[in-house]
Amino acid sequence: MRREILVAAAILLDSRGRVLLVGNDWGRRGRVRYTLPGGTVEPGETAVEALVREVREETGLRVRSVEHLAYVIQVEDRRKNERTLAMAFRATYEGLLNPRDPDGHIVEARFFTLEEVEERLKG
């Protein structure tokens, strides 16, 4: 039976139009992978509840409102017999960046220009 994974992420912009990314180090010998803040929807959670929780954990910011669904992508990994459905929501926030990821994977959270985002997401 295929494992179904649901992921929710936030697209957060600062007052200068820069995009918030978090740097993840999942034990890859110091190699940091940048993503939108977000994560797996846990049993009993809605996608929006997961997004709010993950943004708080990974960045210290509080989601003020979730405005709309910006995009959805589905990825299948036949080797692992998994299908991941990832959703990114445009949201607004308040507070200051203060990452406190309980899993210990977030090594950085900061806003990037669109050019910097493109460079960070290549890897």
Where on the chain are the PLM-derived regions?
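Conserved Nudix-box catalytic region and its N-terminal flanking loop in Nudix hydrolases
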Residues: 18-57
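Residue-level preference for beta-strand/loop junctions
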Residues: 4, 32, 83-85
